[in-house]
Design a protein with these regions (language model features):
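Terminal connector regions
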Residues: 142-171
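Short, charged beta-turn/beta-strand-edge "cap" motif at the junction between a beta-strand
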Residues: 92-95, 139-142, 152
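Histidine-centered copper-binding motifs that mark active-site loops
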Residues: 1-129, 135-136, 165-187
Length: 188
C-alpha cells in the first residue's frame, strides 16, 4: 500500500525488527573478538545496511498465502496413497523468497520456470520472486504439511496434502533466522 512505500522511502529498514543489538554485539565479541566485531559492524554501517536486512517488508506486515489461503485456513490438496503427484510452486510475491519443504516427503524437481530439467531429488528448495518449480511427490501416509517459510524467517505459508478433508500434519517451527555476510553482498 501507499503507506508501506512511504515509510520505506523515509527509512529503508523501517520494517526490520531484528536489527543487531548491544547484546548481539557482546555475543559477537565473545565469539569473534573485539577488532573483528568492530570491523564487521563498520563495514555494514558504511553500506547503510545490517546483516539482518533480508527483506524490506516481512511476515510482520504480510500474511503469506498458499492458493489464496492464510496459514490458519490450511489449503488442502487430496491424494491417494502411492499416487504420484505433480505440484507446481509459483512465487507470486512482490519481494519475498521462500524455502519450501514437505516434512517426511522427498520432492523431485522436474521443471523450473516452465522448462523441463534433469530430475533432482531434494528435501527443500528456495524459490525467488516470479519463479516456478514443478515437483513430483509420492505420499504414502495420511497427511503432509507443505511448508513455505520466508527467507527472513518472519512468516510462512502452509497447506496440507491429505487423503481426506479435515486432516492435517504438524506444522514445523520456523528455522533460525540467517544473517548475511559480506560474501553474500559480494564484498568478500
Amino acid at each position: 500500500s501507499h503507506s508501506l512505500l512511504k515509510k520505506l522511502k523515509k527509512q529503508s529498514d523501517y520494517y526490520n525488527f531484528n536489527k543487531p543489538t548491544v547484546g548481539s554485539f557482546f555475543r559477537d565479541v565473545n565469539t569473534r573478538g573485539l577488532s573483528a566485531t568492530i570491523a564487521d559492524r563498520k563495514m555494514w554501517a558504511e553500506m547503510k545496511m545490517n546483516p539482518t536486512d533480508l527483506a524490506d517488508v516481512s511476515g510482520y506486515t504480510y500474511t503469506y498465502l498458499m492458493n489464496g489461503q492464510a496459514p490458519l485456513k490450511n489449503w488442502t490438496g487430496l491424494f491417494r496413497p502411492g499416487e504420484k503427484i505433480r505440484l507446481r510452486f509459483i512465487n507470486g510475491s512482490a519481494m519475498t523468497y521462500f524455502d519450501i519443504r514437505i516434512p517426511g516427503l522427498k520432492m523431485t524437481v522436474v521443471a523450473a520456470d516452465g522448462q523441463y530439467v534433469n530430475p533432482v531429488t531434494v528435501d527443500e528448495f528456495r524459490i525467488a520472486v516470479a519463479e516456478t518449480y514443478d515437483v513430483i511427490v509420492e505420499p504414502q501416509g495420511e497427511a503432509y504439511t507443505i511448508f513455505a517459510q520466508s527467507m527472513d524467517r518472519t512468516g510462512y505459508a502452509r497447506g496440507t496434502l491429505a487423503t481426506r478433508e479435515g486432516l492435517s500434519a504438524a506444522v514445523p517451527p520456523l528455522d533460525p533466522r540467517p544473517l548475511l555476510t559480506m560474501e553474500d553482498m559480494g564484498m568478500g
